[in-house]
Amino acid sequence: MRIIDFPLSNCVNSGIRRIGVLTQYKAHSLIRHLNLGWGFMRGELGEFVELLPAQQRTSGSWYNGTADAVYQNIDIIRAHDPRFVLVLGGDHIYKMDYGSLLATHAENRADVTVGCMEVPLSEATAFGVIEVDGEGQVSAFREKPAQPKPMPGRPDTALVSMGIYVFNADYLVDRLQRDSEIFDSAHDFGIDLLPRAVAEDRVFASPFRDPRTGERAYWRDVGTLDTYWAANQELIGVLPELDLFDTKWPIRTFQVQGPPAKFVFDDEGRRGMAVDSMVASGCVISGAHIRHSVLFSNVRAEESSRVEYSVVLPRVVIGARCQVHKAVIETGCVLAPDTVIGLNPEHDRQRFEVSPDGVVLVTPEMLNQKLDYIR
């Protein structure tokens, strides 16, 4: 499963079947995943998930900002002639019915609607911060301010953009055209288009809440090692906020074809087992102990090794008697027998990358191993 499967699944579950995925450079792995896992749309019914690399029609460069990425594909928007355009980020984990967001947009007769979340004020510097009036109309938008403004009556909380936007299609085309002609524009939705739209047009905020409880819904930005690790840990809770086993709102993906996971040996000291974990197909737990971890496909853990509070990506080999704690092990790594990771921060920093929260990132390059895939 990949992060982009969440917004794509949200689209399909919401009845949205005309989807363009804007890809930047080094996109081979993403393109392969989409071709394998998202080719079920019915083209004869006008459905598609279409890959849209930089067209380079207006310049010889790649996408130069989020707004420029959409602008370079403006002819595709015109060709399909939609009433609304939904713009989403591909690096967030959440479940959302976009139909409700579109309905709110239409009811408000808005030009733009911004999906938003309430976050602790201390975290708001990483987001676009929104201020709204009593009707929900956005009165100010500041991208990643050094001193974010709290919500009225809630000094410890700020309202921030989720990077989810609904535009009236004609309005979006016009504003993208205008932005392309501004020499010093960063061609970014948060930096350029939204502040101008707030000053000139009807921009509304739509807070993302759980429809059952009315409380803040689950949403995670996983742009850092710490947030990526934490989101994976949350998925394997007994009653996770975001349930991958919810058949009413399935998260679709490309399933690697392989045999079921296998757990072998039942001797003291080398018992093959996994507790509070998710283990994908093709894994072999050969006398190893896996605890509170996520193992992607085709991982092999050898006898007497222990993996705890970790995320192990595909095709990793964990040798005998290894100890891995609070780590992210990247695709294709081979850990030699008796390797210890995550128990000595100073030692880890000499070989690997250690995050502010103490998560250890291990890549094949750090192990002086050749990559068996193209980044």
Regions found by a protein language model. Give the residues of each.
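Unchanged
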Residues: M1-L239, D348-E365, K370-R375
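Left-handed beta-helix
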Residues: D170, R178-R375
